[in-house]
Curated annotation (Swiss-Prot):
It comes from the Bacteria. The gene is slyX. Belongs to the SlyX family. Signal peptide: none annotated. InterPro entries: SlyX (IPR007236). This is Protein SlyX homolog.
């Protein structure tokens, strides 16, 4: 009987440890979710800002003729 009690105690300790680990991981997931949400909002704002920028009057480098030494 003593062996069974010992095994049950070990299982209870492992379960308690796992519960603690799961709670820590859950808190990390919540924090990361907040970080991702913030980054998505920042990306959305940057995209809106980029789309509202007027195009430049300068020609793109691909449209420019190469310098005479080429």
């Amino acid at each position: 009987m003593d062996n069974i009690e010992h095994r049950v105690e070990e299982l209870e300790m492992k379960l308690a440890f796992q519960d603690g680990t799961i709670e820590e991981l859950n808190q990390q997931v919540i924090k990361l979710n907040d970080v991702v949400a913030l980054q998505q909002e920042q990306l959305r704002l940057l995209l809106n800002k980029l789309q509202s920028v007027e195009p430049s009057n300068m020609a793109s480098q691909a449209d420019e003729t190469p310098p005479p030494h080429y």
